[in-house]
Amino acid sequence: MTYDTKVTALIMAGKRSGALDPLAERAGVAQKAVVPVNGVPMVARVADAIAACPEVATIRIIAHEPDEIAAQPGIAKLIEEGRLSFAPGKFNIVDSVFSGAEDADFPLLITTADNCLVTPEGYSEFIGKCLEAQAGGAAGLARKEDVQAADPEGQKRFYEFRDGGFSNCNMYWIGSAKALSAAEIMREGGQFVKFPRRIIKAFGLVNLIRFRFGTGSKEKLFEQVSKRFGFKLVPVELSDGHFAIDVDNERTFAVTEKILKRREGDRTSA
């Protein structure tokens, strides 16, 4: 099924206050978003993939230091074409999302600057499934077995539900201005596998118990959260486990670069 809806894409490219990311320090750059992976800055890879997705009209990068990002050739080209602009990063991820969403045309696709393995087809798959579900909000997930098949070192932690293990793909959907309140789920920083107590504040105690003991399905969890927010939130299962592997540290950097070299050849000396 095809849809005429055009999407605004937000790329979260902020940096943590007061600390230089270790990957950025090693690469000799000021922020993680411009660290090269197989010869191409991370944020440029993500922007290129999104720009090649036919469902996306405009792109906004939310950044604390936009000048270094804007100087990247691929980014500069998209700016010149009028497809890409910047919004200021804020103190936390939720307020940064609100900054990026200001005066934007909905629906919104939200992703991160380190999501280097998602293809244009992957973004299209996510957008299509969100539209088909008529979702007010959504999160992209990949099955544990698919992620491990992509690379066994790509992810170490998974959300365990009654219907299997899943990993977050750092793809989110905000269907309308009303649904923007769903971003509050991330107010404490997300990373619920690492910090389960955050689920109490975001989802409630009963859902924390279901999450910890794998007694509920992902659909049930999203259904309960939908009731809390007053609009439809859905889990979107994606077909490729690579989409759940992003660049968080040296291990996942090495995994991502290895996969990219396999896809496109070695570009580190280009």
Region spans (language model):
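N-terminal nucleotide-binding beta1-loop-alpha1 segment
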Residues: 1-28
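Short catalytic helix/loop segments, enriched in acidic residues and glycine
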Residues: 26-45
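Short beta-strand-to-loop acidic/aromatic patch adjacent to the donor-nucleotide binding site
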Residues: 106-114
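Short, conserved phosphate/pyrophosphate- and ester-handling motifs at nucleotide-, phospho-/glycolipid
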Residues: 249
